[in-house]
């Protein structure tokens, strides 16, 4: 798939970030608990990987880079899901990545736990808050 969306150096319209939820070959969701020492969302469960799109970088490249940095994994496939303008003028590119059967993940230092949650968000554990369930249903 070719991606045409890029952040141009010097553009002042707001920042561009990318977020990628991660699914395995069985459709399960990778959830990671953020470390307690982090300034944003400490000790909260989150889906996937994400970060800022660097100037000149495509969102697909950002997603692949973040998957490697946060989970030490390369996706078998990435699919674009949504482009969302946030209230703070940030634009969020949302994608979904699927891992090859048998792929192993290794969380980075910003995660203190991880789990594979069932394919159906209605079957997720109590640690999954309502915003996570709603977000998952948007891309499921």
What are these model-derived regions, one by one?
Residues 1-45, 51-65, 73-103, 122, ...:
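N-terminal leader/linker segments that precede catalytic domains of diphosphate-processing enzymes
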């Amino acid at each position: 798939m070719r991606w045409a969306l890029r952040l141009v150096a010097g553009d002042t319209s707001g920042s561009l970030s990318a977020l990628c939820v991660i699914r395995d070959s069985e459709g399960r969701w990778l959830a990671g608990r953020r470390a307690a020492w982090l300034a944003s969302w400490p000790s909260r469960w989150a889906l996937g990987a994400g970060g800022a799109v660097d100037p000149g970088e495509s969102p697909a490249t950002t997603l692949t880079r973040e998957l490697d940095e946060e989970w030490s994994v390369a996706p078998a496939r990435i699919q674009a899901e949504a482009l969302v303008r946030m209230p703070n003028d940030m634009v969020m590119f949302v994608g979904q990545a699927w891992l090859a059967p048998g792929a192993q993940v290794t969380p980075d230092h910003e995660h203190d736990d991880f789990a594979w949650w069932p394919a159906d968000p209605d079957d997720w554990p109590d640690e999954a808050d309502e915003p996570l369930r709603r977000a998952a249903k948007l891309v499921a």
